[in-house]
A protein has these predicted regions:
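Bacterial N-terminal signal peptides that target proteins for export
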Residues: 1-7
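Acidic, metal/ion-coordinating pockets
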Residues: 19-306, 312, 346-358, 368, ...
Length: 582
């Protein structure tokens, strides 16, 4: 055999080896997390409680790796990692010198790909750009194929990655939520836009399949499962499942509702949130003539045991945990009255008085909008530590002061209360919009609000009533400004609200007739994140005094009427929402 013949033979061998996996049977385990929301550590930092965490997820993942072999396991996160817990906040904004803890954890845990979520974008460019660089340096792509640069039309983040396991080529594509522009200020996602997942995901899948010739295709989207009727931009999971071709697994997220939907050709997995479950998909391949001849798919959810953690991982990140704990437990002031969010559902409350007081102090605000941000949050009076500020205000929302007419303010409040209450003519009805239905998280029936309580905005700076016997449009009667000045529907006012709300979050601005796509034209001033305002307030005032935060000359007064209907009906509904232990 001459050299040319030998070279040709070698080339043929090389090409044959690249043509596809060897004939035989293969099985891969796809493990997924999503909406981790900063639950990196298993401690609540105070009180000695144990919570579900990435520490416990690691133990769960390793048990599968031990059973089937590390090379047969693929680990993917579907986004919303960098917001929601003290640890994320600390490494996002407080200690920006130490390498961010999440990329280090993702490397330690062996993640193959991470998807960008809307709350990751909410942290701002400095944070997510840094995290993206760190992840990429560890060989972990930060995926968001629908985040398109304004300057050149190319993706801002990575679109996909290819894994090669035992000769099998596995493509993972990732996409962020398409609705981000309706929630977040453009300042947080400057330089890019977020495309609709339909038809973009299919287009990108087709490109990747044509270029990379993968044997397995996984799509990870930071989008809720949804209803599949095409009506919700933030919930496109089932819309995708109905239309995608050439995809084996669709990983969904965002809504915090754990669910799996198996089928012979495409499995949907949504692991819920906060490390409660690990999504688990299995794909078994039969390869004949170096091509995939058949596939079998299955999916399930694996419950995570919060008490069973990886002790080696705990040791590895112990110094990081101590740094977060020290930050979390430092004293910041005194609270002179209990703060609870549940009281906000029935009228004015100390909790919302505080939010309104700080918001309306953002000059030149005359009015403020605010809602209870947790369903049943509570902080007991006494010494405050920084951890309490996360309970009072769990999100990284900035405060915007926005121009609105008096009529827009009234229409906004009418829209808010229409989500909150029913029209009733006697105490026998449900004054609160609640229903007895299955809880997606527990599987048990319980009473809950039909709408999201964090969209139940009330107003500070006004004196008004809300008549529960009247329909939407005539419930809200604004008597005056807090200081007694007349309120004029034709006049323009400066209104303080969160960046989330101003950008269209919750849809209330739209229902008031305001185009949030042009909100920059209405913004007259911006302020830092609300938690920073609260921290600075405590530095200046030392304590939170109910007499100060409840000053009617500053925040006004509002109430539901008529009392003879409201009082007994509210008591009945609140007992259903928050039953007393017997």
């Amino acid at each position: 055999m001459n050299i040319k013949t030998l070279a040709a033979a070698l080339c043929c061998c090389i090409l044959a080896s690249c043509a596809g996996p060897k004939n035989g049977a293969y099985s891969f385990q796809i493990l997924t997390t999503n909406d981790v929301h900063g639950t990196f550590f298993d401690s609540t930092y105070v009180g000695g409680n144990v919570k579900k965490s990435l520490m416990a997820v690691k133990r769960t993942v390793d048990s599968v790796r031990t059973a089937v072999g590390k090379e047969n396991v693929i680990l993917i996160d579907a986004g919303d990692i960098l917001q929601g817990d003290n640890a994320a906040y600390y490494f996002n904004y407080v200690d920006t010198v130490t390498p961010h803890v999440y990329p280090r954890m993702a490397k330690y845990m062996g993640y193959d790909a991470v998807t960008v979520g809307n709350h990751d974008i909410e942290t701002g460019h400095k944070v997510y750009d840094r995290v993206a660089r760190d992840l990429e340096s560890y060989g972990i792509p930060f995926l968001a194929g629908n985040a398109i640069r304004n300057d050149n039309g190319k993706p801002y983040f990575s679109v996909y990655t290819i894994l090669k396991r035992q000769g099998v080529r596995i493509a993972i594509l990732g996409f962020d939520n398409a609705n981000i522009s309706n929630w977040l200020s453009e300042r947080l996602w400057s330089g890019m836009k977020f495309e609709n997942l339909l038809p973009l995901v299919q287009q990108d899948v087709d490109k990747v399949v044509a270029k990379e010739k993968p044997d397995v295709v996984i799509v990870s989207v930071h989008s809720a499962t949804g209803s599949g009727d095409g009506s919700q931009l933030e919930s496109q999971g089932l819309d995708l499942m109905k239309t995608l071709r050439g995809v084996d697994f669709l990983i969904c997220s965002h809504d915090h509702k754990p669910v799996v939907i198996p089928s012979d050709t495409l499995c949907l997995i949504n692991a819920g949130s906060h490390c409660r479950y690990v999504g688990h998909g299995v794909i078994s391949l039969t390869v004949e003539k170096r091509k995939v001849a058949s596939k079998e798919l299955s999916c399930e959810l694996i419950p995570v045991d919060r008490y069973k953690i990886d002790p080696e991982m705990e040791k590895e990140f112990h110094d990081d945990y101590l740094a977060v704990k020290d930050f979390t437990t430092r004293e910041v002031g005194e609270l002179m009255v209990d703060l609870g969010t549940r009281e906000a559902y029935t009228g004015m409350s100390h909790y919302l008085n505080l939010i309104h007081t700080l918001s309306i102090s953002c000059s030149p605000a005359q009015v403020s909008f605010a809602a209870p941000l947790t369903f049943n949050g509570f902080v007991r009076k006494g010494k405050l530590i920084y951890n309490d500020l996360f309970t009072i205000y769990p999100f990284e929302n900035q405060i915007y002061v926005v121009r609105m007419t008096g009529q827009e303010i009234k229409d906004y409040l009418e829209a808010s209360y229409d989500r909150w209450i029913n029209t009733v003519d006697s105490p026998a009805g449900h004054v609160l919009k609640i229903a007895d239905r299955d809880d997606a998280r527990t599987g048990q029936k319980s009473w809950s609000f039909i709408e999201r309580a964090y969209n139940f905005d009330s107003a500070g700076g006004l004196v008004y009533t809300v008549d529960v016997t009247k329909p939407r449009g005539s419930r809200v009667d604004i008597k005056s400004m807090a200081g007694g000045q007349p309120f004029d529907t034709g006049k323009e006012y400066k209104v303080a609200m969160t960046s989330y709300r101003a950008s269209g979050g919750g849809g209330l601005m739209k229902e008031a007739g305001i185009d949030t796509g042009k909100i920059e034209e209405r913004i007259v001033e911006t302020y830092p994140e609300f938690r920073d305002l609260l921290y600075n307030y405590l530095k200046d005032n030392v304590s939170i005094d109910p007499a100060v935060i409840g000053d009617p000359v500053r925040i006004g007064h509002w109430e539901f009427i008529p009392e003879e209907i409201v009082k007994p009906a509210m008591e009945k509904d609140m007992e259903l929402l928050f039953p007393r232990r017997r």
